From Swiss-Prot:
A Pfam short name: PUB10_N
Name of the protein: U-box domain-containing protein 15
Organism: Arabidopsis thaliana (Mouse-ear cress)
Gene Ontology biological-process entries: cell surface receptor signaling pathway; protein ubiquitination
SMART domains, alphabetized: ARM, Ubox
Amino acid sequence: MVDVMDTDEEATGDAENRDEEVTAEEPIHDEVVDAVEIHEEEVKEDDDDCEGLVSDIVSIVEFLDQINGYRRTQQKECFNLVRRLKILIPFLDEIRGFESPSCKHFLNRLRKVFLAAKKLLETCSNGSKIYMALDGETMMTRFHSIYEKLNRVLVKAPFDELMISGDAKDEIDSLCKQLKKAKRRTDTQDIELAVDMMVVFSKTDPRNADSAIIERLAKKLELQTIDDLKTETIAIQSLIQDKGGLNIETKQHIIELLNKFKKLQGLEATDILYQPVINKAITKSTSLILPHEFLCPITLEIMLDPVIIATGQTYEKESIQKWFDAGHKTCPKTRQELDHLSLAPNFALKNLIMQWCEKNNFKIPEKEVSPDSQNEQKDEVSLLVEALSSSQLEEQRRSVKQMRLLARENPENRVLIANAGAIPLLVQLLSYPDSGIQENAVTTLLNLSIDEVNKKLISNEGAIPNIIEILENGNREARENSAAALFSLSMLDENKVTIGLSNGIPPLVDLLQHGTLRGKKDALTALFNLSLNSANKGRAIDAGIVQPLLNLLKDKNLGMIDEALSILLLLASHPEGRQAIGQLSFIETLVEFIRQGTPKNKECATSVLLELGSNNSSFILAALQFGVYEYLVEITTSGTNRAQRKANALIQLISKSEQI
């Protein structure tokens, strides 16, 4: 059985984080908005390199994506802020390996903005609901301060030096326009809320004690249960303690309304100004401590549906699925690469959690959803799908590009877009005589294809021949994204056959030979997956794949040695493949990688030599001439687990060959 390479983050998962890429409390301040100000002249440079800074920023976004329970008064703005921050993920992935002083300075400043956004969003998740409703204007000022600072940092980014793709630059320009246009919004619900609060605090309005208004406010602010009111009391105490500048009138209004809500629940009104302030985290844990093993390592929340991944670690199913959907193929806790992305229910742990909760009378928290946000997204998608059939060229261009961005954003959008009937229309646009529409259509399909159901829908619509046509004749970025789309679709075995029969392999080999670095990587991953099909191995060999692969082995700077060796391993299982690669110079190259390559290089090269030698002992004899034996002995004790297995098998094969 031929071992194949572990496809990494440059594969299908990357479609979410790339358009054309291969490839987680602060006190609330009313007067002092400077808590989120980023003073450019005072930005301290961090010692991290650019790679580390990018990882930090991406980690912040991943953390923010897990935050639940935004206060209703700021919920929509919170979702908007997170969405805008996530737009930068593909750009960050694109510059991840770039190192320069100007890039480091830019990323340091960008991280400062993301940290400020994190503080604000945590406040909107944990802060006093009454205060945020009472002083919504100040909260909006803080959001707009973030927008202004983010725009300022992006405008001064060293784009020319970073050499990012034109499409990534267009997305950043579009984001900057959004940030500039962001207006302070007052929803109808907010107006009603403001009027109710004005009535409640009025000294002259006879309705100020009207229980119906109080009940309505309690419902809007979600302060209707005893637990809600206890949590709000702690939040207000912390606010008053931390915020020394909170004026007396504001304090009185907050406490007055809190006491009105308490009376509705039959609780005694108290003056919390004179009660000791208890830290919220301590309050939650003094009476009951959650067992560490019950908490998801990603969210640090109790697990409702624990599942086991390939490394044996357990996570909340929803959280780890989001991690995978974002294109990651590593364990979040151990950072190990995963052999597979299968999830196995941890029934034993789930039963333990349920028993513990029942025994301790622990109420499992419900996660909040945003139905308003979901409905808005559905409406937006419906309008975009309708616009795909417009007779106006510019409207078609705008809609397909916007859909492309939505499809990349999250798994939910991919399902929404497919359910709205977009896939047949997008497939039709692949043949549209406009290079921009073609490029955006094929990239949208690439992003949609991350979803397994969508893979089938796309191929059932007959998209593959049209994608191959763009691969042959489209512009540079369209060709690269077509290759990535073919890789994604080829995850289904029937599509491997269809792509091979549709003559999709020769243009992939051409892109591997003549494409840009990203184009080569897209082609390489697609060809690897297609070569898992026996008939496609022969097609790839006939298309001349061997020489481009050998060329990749000569240039370490391209960073594709392991991938090239992995495809050569597949080809070595084919008679024509062995004939094409079995040159003396290639055997010498393999031995050189076994001698002084990276651990993964050694693993892959040893695997290729074992496959060749298992079919023809002359390859073993040739390798011995280049001194391979002592290098294999070293690998048996110091190599990766797989490399050790392969080296031991190869040593046994050498012993048999010598006996013969």
